[in-house]
Amino acid sequence: GRISGCVNNGDVSAAAQASGKVVCAGGVLGTFDRSDDAGDTAEVHSNTNNGTVTNSSDVKTLCVGGVVGRSSNGTCVIRDCINKGTVVSNSTAVNKVQANRSNFVGGVSGQNSGSISGCTNHGDVSSTSYYWETRIGGVAGTVFGGQRIIGCTNETEATVTTKYERKFNSENAAVVDQEHLGGVIGQCEGSIVDCTNRGTVDQASDPRTVNAGGICGFVRNAAESLSGNANE
C-alpha cells in the first residue's frame, strides 16, 4: 500500500499516560507498519507536513516525527517527504525516569525500521523530555535493522536540540542516562549515504553519556557505512 501526495497543515499532539506502552505522533502518520502477507513494499512518499507535532506522553517508548512517528517494519519505505513543522518531545514526568524508557525524535521519522530516501527537514527538532535514553535527529531519531538512509537533508534553518536540568528520581535515584544527537540521524544501525546537514546540533542537557555529530550521533554497528555525506 501507499500513502502519497498528502499535506498536513494542522498541529498534532499526543499526551498519554500509559506505563509500558508505545505512543507515537506524526504529522501524516503516527505509526507506519505492514503485515507480512501484505504484498509489495509499503511506501509513504511525496507527503508534506507544515504543522507542529508534539508528544508529551509519559510512556515506555515515545516516538515523534514530522511526517511519521514510527516506521516499525523493515519493508516500509519513506521517500521524497518534506517536513516544515516544528517537532517536539516535551514529557515532564521527572519522577518516573526508569531504565529502558526511550525517546525517539526526528524531523521526518522518530523511530525507523525501514529505508528513508530523498527526504528533507526544514523544522526545528527538540526534546526537553526526561527519558532514560533519547535519540534525536534532523531526519530520523533512530534507524534500526541495517537500513539505508540515502540523499536526505537537514536544512539550514533546522536546529536539533536537547535541553533539561539533571534531576534525580525521588524513588530510586535514576537519572537520564544517554543521548545521541545527529544533524541527520541520532543513532544509526544501518548506512547513511549522500546525506547533508546544514542545520545546528545543540546538546545543552546533562545525561551520563552524550554522542553528538553533524551527520550521526552514534553508529551502533561499526560494520555499517557512512559515505558521501556532508556537514555544512
Which residues make up each language-model segment?
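Surface-exposed loop/turn motifs in large extracellular/passenger domains
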Residues: 1-232
